[in-house]
Amino acid sequence: MCVNSCVAFVGPFLELDACPECDEPRFNVHHQTHTNKHIPRVVFHTIPIGPQLQALWRHPESTEKMCYRVKKMQEVFDQLLKNDGLVDSYDDIFCSSAYINRVVDGTIQLEDMLLMISIDGAQLFKSKESDCWIYIWVILELLPDHRYKKKHILPGVIIPGPKKPKFIESFLFLGLHHFSALQCEGLTIWDSGCRREFISRLFLFLACADGPGLLTMSSLVGHQGKVGCCMQCPLKGCQKPGTSQYYPVLLKPNNYDVSGCTHADINVYSINSSM
């Protein structure tokens, strides 16, 4: 990867010898000159999800935990039949119509596995610049009380800093390419509880992040841009005078006259995709 965390040299950047953003050399020039070997200056780490999931099925105790979704699904369908299409309470994502519809139409099968991906940056030390970016896998097959616990979270990638990645897609490429292959071909699982082998397909059910993380993943302008949410609503922000920051305020500020931001007050009930 680039020493300034710009890109990972994978996919379309695989054959490059220098960063396309900052032009820093990819390989250690000293080693290359004296040993004729291509030694990367910096590396990042991708942990494939497939082997991690296979390991969870190799012990009867963890195998039992991985059966939560199937049990919950049966419970939800019993409630739907009893309550004329309604569930008793919406206490998990498996009560959602998005999930139920995919089960009904056969897209999601009993032996498949649903996952959530989440990406975020972390400052490792308080007194120095030391950003590190990671993405994790949350296994939705587990109970809600278990799936978010540290011991059940699976690492996906670790991107060393100190700077923020500029082409985050390049760092996600290897892990998601592996994930895509498992979606197409299936993942062979040994169920130690039932002592059987089966093929499971993976589903990326949710992709989550905080504000900066979502901005990095989506490549959009972010909440401080002029049109912070250009996909769902066209609400324009008001620029803070003398800065490049915009704020999505509904009421026009008093004594405010900034070019391009002089639109009238906006009724919150009028905000929609056709605004």
Predicted regions and their residues:
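Acidic, metal-ligating active-site segments
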Residues: 92-96, 102, 108-161
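Amphipathic alpha-helical interface elements that mediate macromolecular binding in regulatory proteins
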Residues: 17-20, 25, 51, 113, ...
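Short linker/helix segments within small regulatory modules
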Residues: 10-17
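Generic recognition of stable, solvent-exposed alpha-helical segments in well-folded globular domains
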Residues: 14, 48, 110, 114-117, ...
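Short, intrinsically disordered, charge-biased short linear motifs at domain edges
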Residues: 1-10, 212-220
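Short, cysteine/histidine-rich loop/knuckle motifs that typically chelate Zn2+
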Residues: 1-4, 21, 231
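Domain-level detector for long, ordered catalytic/regulatory cores in large eukaryotic signaling
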Residues: 15, 25-95, 99, 172, ...
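Conserved, non-catalytic sequence blocks in retroelement Pol enzymes and Pol-derived host proteins
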Residues: 8-10, 127-128, 160-168
